[in-house]
Amino acid sequence: IVMYGIQAIIKLRLQVWRALLIGIIIFIALNGTFFLRNYSAFQHPLAPDTTLQNTFIGIQPIATNTVKNLAMHFLSPWPAINNVVTSIVIKYHQFIHTDINDPRFSWEFSPPFSASQLYPHEDYATAPFYILFFLIACAYLLFNMRKHSWKISIYALVIISMWLTFSLLLKWQVWHCRLHLPMLLASTPLIAFYLNNCRKSVRIVSIVVFILFALPSIFYNYSRPIIGKNSIFTNSKYDQYFFNQPTNQKPFFDISAIMQRNNLKNIGWIISGDSWEYPMWVLLNDETHLRMEHILVKNATQKFEDASFIPDGIINKMIEPDSLGRIYYHNTIYQVVYENDPWMFMQKVGD
């Protein structure tokens, strides 16, 4: 932003305020409602979660996390190559005298760093050729700066600063590859610029390589494959909601059936922050006057809980009922009527 701001001042001069105003309006239009929501809940526009932030800001988190973030994109179907990548990253950390899994820079709930086998899953998808061509494009610009407009060099610096800022602020975790997507997309014009300055044969080979290596993730994608027994063309949309967590399918179908059979319209949820909820909205999409609320919330959003809400039933994944299979909420007794570990459905006694 700073780099493009300087460029705008140089180019537009007195008209820069018009461009600045347009930029501010676009920024507020895209992010304003999220900032307001976060501020109302956390008294901070960015809803800070210190568990995901590096313990301190400095060179060390950049040095370790940038390398690990980039290395994760070089996974391959061949264990020998993955072992080489892992070995290089380990030796690099030994050289800089930093623990590769230092808890100050690695999220505690993430598995330790390892360049294991390539996995065509939306949570772990990698982009090795994007990273490789981005690095080559940066090297090309470095050695040919005088041949091209300084604007493209600034653009490259912006993308590099995005990677460094990402590594500076966030603890490394194995699921970071999916969060790199904005930076990968931003690097596309730079890669195209580099290929445009290559021989035609290089461009053709590069395009073919990109396409060929994209096909396995399309056809054999774990979550939404085109072919195979889980093909998106041979499975219902309801089945596809549970491809990533198939053990949730039966309890969700069973609980939704109980709710519909007993005409239960007010449902409370007692679940963790990482638990699924949205498939239930899909299964009950045809229900009218349906209301579902989170209850017994223990985080910063607890103040938004509606104390007047008395659910007809409770979907419970967090609280252990008493010896009689009951819990109490707002002086009302709820009895377990269905259980499929870890899910329980509890109905108000008397209904």
Regions found by a protein language model. Give the residues of each.
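Hydrophobic/aromatic-rich transmembrane helices and adjacent perimembrane loops
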Residues: 1, 43, 130, 160-165, ...
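Signature aromatic-anchored transmembrane alpha helix within multi-pass, membrane-resident enzymes
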Residues: 2-5, 9, 16-28, 148-149, ...
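Repeat-solenoid scaffold signature
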Residues: 4, 15-57, 183-184, 189-196
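Aromatic-rich transmembrane-lumenal/periplasmic boundary elements in polytopic membrane proteins
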Residues: 31-95
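Membrane-interface anchor segments at the N-terminal boundary of transmembrane helices
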Residues: 81-156
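Membrane-proximal, lumen/periplasm-facing interface regions of secretory-pathway glyco-
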Residues: 206-260, 273-278
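Extracytoplasmic
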Residues: 271-306
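Aromatic/acidic, Gly/Pro-rich catalytic loop(s) in extracytoplasmic/lumenal soluble domains
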Residues: 300-351
